[in-house]
Amino acid sequence: MANRFILNETSYHGAGAIRSIADEVRMRKLTKAFVCSDPDLLRFQVTQKVTAVLEEAGLAYEMYSDIKPNPTIENVQNGVKAFRDSGADYIIAIGGGSSMDTAKAVGIIIANPEHEDVRSLEGAVVTANPSVPIIAVPTTAGTAAEVTINYVITDVEKNRKFVCVDPHDIPVVAVVDPEMMASMPKGLTAATGMDALTHAIEGYITAGAWELSDMFHLKAIEIIARSLRGAVANTPEGREGMALGQYVAGMGFSNVGLGIVHSMAHPLGALYDTPHGVANAIILPTVMEYNAPATGEKYRDIAAAMGVKGTESMTQEEYRRAAVEAVRQLAADVGIPKDLRDIVKKEDIPFLAQSAYDDACRPGNPRETSVEDIAALYTSLL
């Protein structure tokens, strides 16, 4: 069987990378940007770091900021209308996963108007045309949406999130500039960083994993494990490490899939508006314990990448426990809650479990699971 791997056409990394945007726009002969960013980034003058580059180069743009932390169908619909009214021919997405996911959905619908209803794109729908060009500038070190082929939209009416997977949605250019992430508060840095670690660990053990994706995921775990505490403390080294680590994780998981940590996190975002990274971080150690019997020796590699010493001489039980505890300790060190008691209502568990089982990430889980298994996992976290 052939293994497919899809990455950005071009990516820029390092402090000051946003200054490369003007040259990319000129080279691609693009004329007007539809800048997709959330209101908080505008209020804190983060988005303006990029628009200043455009203004200095004399490049036209129009702003769109009708974006929520878990973007909705309405956000996408409004974005499609605003893009058509703007006269733009490309998108600059500035932000975390919410801005990126909104931009991807808008870009795909503009290029494929037969999918005017974004719900028609759920799953791995084959679209006829690539998205309008997207230049993605992440401001969080976690989602890696700038290098992935998927996006997640919330259906408010049905209290659910749905995943759309489409090679046509990947940004043509990713600009990963740690200076764009420096204003992230500690809590957001911790949550998005643990999201990145979840991508790397789930991607490493997912059913579709293979040698090339393994290489990216193990390196990502190593970089994130040594960088996240520093990033939360706002050190330059920590910020730079997380900017790279989350991108490397995205290079991997986008091409092989994830598992039930993400399946269980998605309904929490849809029902309670729980930040995605926080949900992943709380769930990850418990699901790692559940999945351990289906992972062979991979937890030995995870433990070593997390910085655990002496893994080569450990028994299977020891290195599996060490991997889980290293993840749990990192989450505690960066201030992640230990459980879901303040988030989940017990009476909602049947709905959450069914939603998680139906989620597009669930089939990638290395261990066969059921609605009942997932309900038990939620219950164990209360």
Protein language model features and the residues they cover:
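C-terminal charged capping/lid subdomain of soluble metabolic enzymes
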Residues: 299, 309-382
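Short glycine/serine/threonine-rich phosphate/pyrophosphate-binding segments
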Residues: 18-21, 43-46, 73-76, 99-103, ...
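N-terminal small/polar loop signature for handling phosphorylated ligands or for N-terminal nucleophile
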Residues: 42-115, 229-239
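Catalytic phosphate/nucleotide-handling subdomain of diverse soluble enzymes
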Residues: 267-306
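Glycine/threonine-rich beta-strand-loop-alpha-helix active-site module
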Residues: 74-179
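An N-terminal, well-structured beta->alpha segment
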Residues: 1-64
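Carboxylate- and glycine-rich phosphate/diphosphate-binding segment that chelates Mg2+/Mn2+
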Residues: 150-256
